[in-house]
A protein has these predicted regions:
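Accessory DNA-engaging acidic/polar modules
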Residues: 1-129
């Protein structure tokens, strides 16, 4: 009898290259996996940061072995949105990799295209260079 692989793939996780480091955001409900990734966790920003390609490769391999689909994003151009700094953007902030102020707006690099779309529905605009 042939065996069928019924391993369920978890969601894809985008790993962004920004400013010579690699970042991703994901909530893991597997405490064992989180403990393995904990050395890379930036608690203040609720994200994971790898400072070099070797660490990134190690994390991507671990995520893949745990059933996730890690995707390296070297061009983050489609992911930034901007929203007025006085608008309610807390939910967007929780689902962004990076954020910074820009005049009367806040620029957010969203963690995936689902959240880019959500941000646009909440009144954000795509950030153009």
């Amino acid at each position: 009898m042939s065996s069928i692989d019924i391993t369920e793939k978890h969601p894809s996780i985008n790993i962004f290259k920004l400013n010579n480091a690699y970042y991703f955001k994901h909530f893991f409900d597997d405490p064992e996996l989180f403990n393995e990734l904990e050395p890379y966790y930036e608690k203040a920003n609720y994200r994971f940061k790898m400072t070099n390609a070797g660490a990134r490769n190690k994390v991507m391999k671990l995520l893949d072995m745990k059933g996730f689909d890690p995707n390296l994003i070297e061009d983050a151009a489609p992911y930034p949105v901007e929203i007025g700094k006085y608008q309610n953007y807390g939910e967007l902030l929780k689902n962004s990799i990076e954020s910074y102020p820009l005049r009367d707006k806040v620029v957010l690099v969203m963690k995936d295209m689902v959240w880019v779309k959500q941000a646009l529905e909440m009144g954000a605009m795509l950030k153009t260079h």
